[in-house]
């Protein structure tokens, strides 16, 4: 399998120019597409004669993507690929990546903290906490399962034995807000029989789901959803 890798920071010899780096990488890949590489360089506005030591972080990130794509990998691994890019460059980066995926059907694995951005096009999401995988599911499954519940507060209100995991619990006057994992609409009736006054189920964006998982005080048991 042909594998491409985009590191969070490019570290080839600083004396190399962009053009020399492209020729250097081409030697190691039988499938290197020189014409494609040149078109990427033009599109990404990479100056061919500039030494790598003089590239900005954004330019270095673009060059990393070019070097990873030009041999047309079947699997592309990216480590914080847009961390150093401004909003416009980040959008151009993602558009180029999506075009490559559409053209080649390559599998792309991205490590990033820009959760909301990735959620717009990713099929599958895996969440890690303290080096441990705690959630693996289709992207839509994360938003379906993690909710905030607005409930009426009561002195003896307990979350023990409920059919979902309570990640967090906050009191706001006469109401409480629970962050829960494993929510299903059918659980409304269960809450009613337990005397819980459920007032609202709040849908969360992908980034909010990530935040709730990260700030849960107790370790969250790993969950692996079926494909």
Task: Describe each PLM feature range.
Residues 17, 138, 202-205:
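Short loop/turn segments at beta->alpha junctions
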Residues 22, 38, 91, 143, ...:
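Generic structural signal for individual residues within well-ordered alpha-helical segments
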Residues 93-185:
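ABC transporter nucleotide-binding domain
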Residues 1-129, 134-135:
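ABC transporter nucleotide-binding domains
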Residues 179-227:
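C-terminal coupling/interaction segments
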Residues 4, 30, 45, 139, ...:
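A generic structural signal for secondary-structure junctions
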């Amino acid at each position: 399998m042909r594998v491409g890798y985009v590191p969070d920071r490019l570290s080839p010899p600083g004396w190399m120019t962009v053009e020399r780096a492209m020729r250097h990488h081409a030697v190691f890949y039988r499938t290197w597409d020189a014409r494609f590489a040149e078109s990427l360089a033009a599109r990404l506005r990479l100056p061919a004669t500039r030494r790598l030591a003089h590239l900005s972080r954004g330019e270095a990130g673009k060059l990393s993507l070019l070097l990873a794509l030009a041999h047309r990998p079947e699997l592309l691994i990216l480590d914080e690929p847009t961390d150093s890019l401004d909003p416009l460059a980040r959008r151009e980066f993602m558009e180029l990546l999506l075009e490559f995926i559409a053209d080649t059907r390559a599998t792309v694995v991205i490590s990033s903290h820009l959760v909301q951005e990735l959620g717009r096009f990713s099929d599958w999401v895996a969440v890690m906490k303290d080096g441990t995988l705690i959630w693996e599911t289709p992207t839509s499954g994360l938003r379906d399962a993690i909710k905030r519940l607005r409930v009426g507060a009561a002195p003896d209100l307990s979350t023990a034995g409920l059919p979902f995991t309570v990640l967090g619990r906050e009191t706001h006057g006469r109401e409480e807000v629970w962050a829960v994992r494993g929510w299903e609409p059918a659980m409304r009736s269960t809450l009613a029989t337990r005397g819980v006054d459920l007032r609202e189920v709040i849908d969360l964006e992908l980034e909010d789901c990530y935040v709730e998982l990260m700030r849960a005080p107790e370790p969250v048991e790993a969950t692996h959803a079926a494909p």
